[in-house]
């Protein structure tokens, strides 16, 4: 089992540590590799897109030629998880802010995103979030977070705040507007690992 973390930019080490902890919790093992260039994605059984600066992340993925490999992985049913900026990358469409920056989107999910959904006044916040696959609230850390403004028919909404969708799933792709790698609660990473091991 091999999990690839897009390591071009963003919260890479935090995701690696969280995945290692989540694997240890379930008594499972997997190799975790950093993806910085073409050729690694096709060797992976699961992919993680970390938070970071979405415009930079998208541009570098395109430049390195990783985008086509990611789309192929999606078509093959490889589990994929995007968090914060990673959520933006999974989208099919974005708001005017996304368009203005010529943000490269991978179109893995039938969703439209608002890049800075919670406004400048909420640079970051934490909230006890009700997520459909969890039986108790999850302490979600939001940092200049995006949100999903439109979700297509095949998209399952997992969590919302004030009418804004902040977690969703479509087929083998998971998208979270918050940073699960910044908490001690491994349940979101476990949900991703469930897709790999089941």
UniProtKB/Swiss-Prot annotation:
Pfam families to which the protein is assigned, alphabetical: SNO (PF01174)
InterPro entries: Class_I_gatase-like, PdxT/SNO, PdxT/SNO_CS
Keyword set, alphabetical order: Glutamine amidotransferase, Hydrolase, Lyase, Pyridoxal phosphate
GO BP terms: glutamine catabolic process; pyridoxal phosphate biosynthetic process; pyridoxine metabolic process
Pathway: Cofactor biosynthesis; pyridoxal 5'-phosphate biosynthesis
UniProt GO cellular component terms: cytosol; glutaminase complex
Entry EC number(s): 4.3.3.6, 3.5.1.2
Residue sites binding L-glutamine per the record: 52-54, 115, 143-144
Reactions the enzyme catalyzes: aldehydo-D-ribose 5-phosphate + D-glyceraldehyde 3-phosphate + L-glutamine = pyridoxal 5'-phosphate + L-glutamate + phosphate + 3 H2O + H(+); L-glutamine + H2O = L-glutamate + NH4(+)
Enzyme active site: 84, 179, 181
Superkingdom field: Archaea
An annotated Gene Ontology molecular function: pyridoxal 5'-phosphate synthase (glutamine hydrolysing) activity
Keyword presence, Hydrolase: yes
Family: Belongs to the glutaminase PdxT/SNO family.
Function: Catalyzes the hydrolysis of glutamine to glutamate and ammonia as part of the biosynthesis of pyridoxal 5'-phosphate. The resulting ammonia molecule is channeled to the active site of PdxS.
Subunit architecture: In the presence of PdxS, forms a dodecamer of heterodimers. Only shows activity in the heterodimer.
This protein's name: Pyridoxal 5'-phosphate synthase subunit PdxT
């Amino acid at each position: 089992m091999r999990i690839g973390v897009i390591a071009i930019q963003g919260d890479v080490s935090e995701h690696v540590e969280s995945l290692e902890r989540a694997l240890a919790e379930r008594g499972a093992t997997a190799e975790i590799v950093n993806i910085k260039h073409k050729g690694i994605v096709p060797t992976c059984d699961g992919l993680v897109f970390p938070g970071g600066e979405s415009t930079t992340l998208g541009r570098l993925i395109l430049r390195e030629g990783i985008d086509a490999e990611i789309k192929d992985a999606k078509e093959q049913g490889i589990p994929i998880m995007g968090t914060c900026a990673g959520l933006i990358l999974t989208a099919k469409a974005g708001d005017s802010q996304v368009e203005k920056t010529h943000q490269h989107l991978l179109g893995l999910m039938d969703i439209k995103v608002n890049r800075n959904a919670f406004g400048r006044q909420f640079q970051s916040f934490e909230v006890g979030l009700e997520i459909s696959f969890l039986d108790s609230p999850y302490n979600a850390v939001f940092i200049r977070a995006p949100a999903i403004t439109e979700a297509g028919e095949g998209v399952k909404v997992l969590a919302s705040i004030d009418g804004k969708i902040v977690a969703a799933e479509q087929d083998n792709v998971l998208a979270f507007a918050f940073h699960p790698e910044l908490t001690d609660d491994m349940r979101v990473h476990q949900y991703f690992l469930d897709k790999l091991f089941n």
